[in-house]
């Protein structure tokens, strides 16, 4: 999960700031929660 957070912080935030002309990092939407669901039963 740390890899995803680092990627978002380092790459995605920069792209969003340039795409939407944000003046501050605090204006960029942040990821609050990621939920994964995987079924392992027989289909």
UniProtKB/Swiss-Prot annotation:
The keyword Nucleotidyltransferase does not apply. It comes from the Bacteria. InterPro entries: Ribosomal_uL5_dom_sf. GO terms for molecular function: rRNA binding; tRNA binding. Keywords: Ribonucleoprotein, Ribosomal protein, RNA-binding, rRNA-binding, tRNA-binding. GO terms for cellular component: ribonucleoprotein complex; ribosome. Gene3D superfamilies: 3.30.1440.10. This is one of the proteins that bind and probably mediate the attachment of the 5S RNA into the large ribosomal subunit, where it forms part of the central protuberance. In the 70S ribosome it contacts protein S13 of the 30S subunit (bridge B1b), connecting the 2 subunits; this bridge is implicated in subunit movement. Contacts the P site tRNA; the 5S rRNA and some of its associated proteins might help stabilize positioning of ribosome-bound tRNAs. Belongs to the universal ribosomal protein uL5 family. Part of the 50S ribosomal subunit; part of the 5S rRNA/L5/L18/L25 subcomplex. Contacts the 5S rRNA and the P site tRNA. Forms a bridge to the 30S subunit in the 70S ribosome. This is Large ribosomal subunit protein uL5. It comes from Serratia marcescens.
